[in-house]
Amino acid sequence: ITFTWTTNKDITTQTLTGCTLADETVRTATYDTDISSDKTFTLSVSDGENSASSSVSYKFMNNVFWGSAAAADVYDSAFVDALSNKKLTNSVKGTYSFNVADGEYGFWAVPSNMTISTVWIGGFEVTVESVGTISYLNSKGYTRDYNLYKTGQSGLGSISAEIK
């Protein structure tokens, strides 16, 4: 994350959460540590008499993955990555549109702090089965437990599934 700022007067000190600033003339900084939880950064400046600060917060979110696939003997990170859709979110609730091909099932992989209890397709409640929890490793080396669910029926065709 790169930060850039300006001041309307000369300052004598400044600090920015998690960043080393060479001196009071610097007006840009980079935070190059991976973020795996919500984080707030605060820039504090002083001219020797008066102080001011400003903060910005980043909300850490995980992906929800969904798509069509054949049932597998082993569910792992590669299986989840092969699902055709993903979105960053802090809630699994919403509408998921995709095609469930013949011989395949609809799958959702959701962070372990989320669960799927009800799925509606075409106005009808449908059964989804939990196929377990996997330890998902993303391309950045971040590991998170994910719950994996699949539709009870295969070959549903083009669907718009609502998770409530």
Where are these regions (language model features)?
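Aromatic/hydrophobic beta-strand junction motif of beta-rich domains
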Residues: F3-T7, F107-P111
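Extended Gly/Ser/Thr-rich low-complexity repeat segments
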Residues: T13-C19, S154-K164
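Short S/T/G- and acidic-enriched coil/turn segments that sit immediately N-terminal to beta-strands
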Residues: T25-A29
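Surface-exposed, short loops/turns at beta-strand junctions within beta-sandwich domains
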Residues: T30-T40, G48-N50, G141-S158
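Short, exposed coil/turn segments at beta-strand boundaries within extracellular/luminal domains
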Residues: S46-M61
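Extracellular receptor-binding modules and their adjoining Ser/Thr/Gly/Asp/Asn-rich linkers
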Residues: N63-E104
